Design a protein with these regions (language model features):
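Boundary/linker segments flanking structured domains
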Residues: 1-55, 60-163
């Protein structure tokens, strides 16, 4: 496989490492057995045989993941997954970002990372409705997924590359 390199290595606008938690149940999340204070990202994941797959990727900015998962749209998503895949024990993995440059975590940065995660991890069974068919940003972005990354690609990049 051919290797590609950043055209402007020192000009990556958004460089983030996301530490993904081990899978946790909804019950563990709602019983506050999971530290979710720093999590900005989450994924609904299911185990198929020996492999985990991500079926939904989302973000939170002004609320906790547990609060988000009590909202009506997420209750509908859980019901849809339980209906489509009744034998799967759905779990969550929470993502804590570490932005590798000076600056605040902003809504725009979180939105850009979420969009690229969704777009780059799409497959036929994903239940995300937006950000699956296209992604655009005026930023060059590098995401390194770390920790429990079985359902994810280790690196996702967006920008001008050369070979």
């Amino acid at each position: 496989m051919k290797k590609y390199y950043w055209a402007h290595e020192n000009e990556i606008d958004l460089d983030v490492t996301i530490e993904w938690s081990k899978p946790v149940s909804y019950q563990e999340l709602f019983d506050e057995k999971v530290d979710e204070e720093e999590a900005f990202f989450y994924s609904i994941i299911g185990r198929f045989g020996k492999h985990w797959k991500s079926f939904y990727i989302g973000k939170v900015y002004d609320q906790y993941v547990s609060t988000r998962h009590e909202n009506p749209d997420h209750l509908i998503r859980r019901e849809l997954l339980n209906t489509e895949y009744p034998k799967i024990d759905w779990q969550l993995t929470l993502g804590i970002p570490k932005f590798n440059e000076v600056g605040r975590i902003t809504r725009n940065r979180v939105n850009a990372v979420e969009g690229l995660l969704i777009y780059s991890h799409w497959h036929d069974e994903v239940i995300n409705k937006s950000k699956v068919n296209s992604f655009h940003s005026n930023l060059s972005i590098r995401i390194r997924n770390h920790g429990f990354i079985e359902p994810f690609k280790e690196y996702v990049v967006y920008g001008v590359m050369t070979s």
